[in-house]
């Protein structure tokens, strides 16, 4: 399932995520198999881009790479871009981080 969520593109690796804001802590949750997205919980509220900034900072810490929001800047369903990692690198990191694997 994780291989369907992590995709290669010309610009880098794309990951489909679903964001829950106002969480107790920043964390990667489980895979939402119905939506084919990884659940990300963020403490910040979606006000004036604070949640998007928190998502990028949180994921940058996990992937040790630049993170860009490719689509969904105003939606809970987003696609993030990681320009300088391979799909294999990302899948390995996610398998360690995701709670349902």
UniProtKB/Swiss-Prot annotation:
Database matches in SUPFAM superfamilies: YggU-like
InterPro entries recorded: DUF167, YggU-like_sf
Domain of life: Archaea
GO CC field: cytoplasm
Any single Pfam family the record assigns to this protein: DUF167
Family, per entry: Belongs to the UPF0235 family.
Protein's recorded name: UPF0235 protein MmarC5_0538
Lineage summary: Archaea, Methanobacteriati, Methanobacteriota, Methanomada group, Methanococci
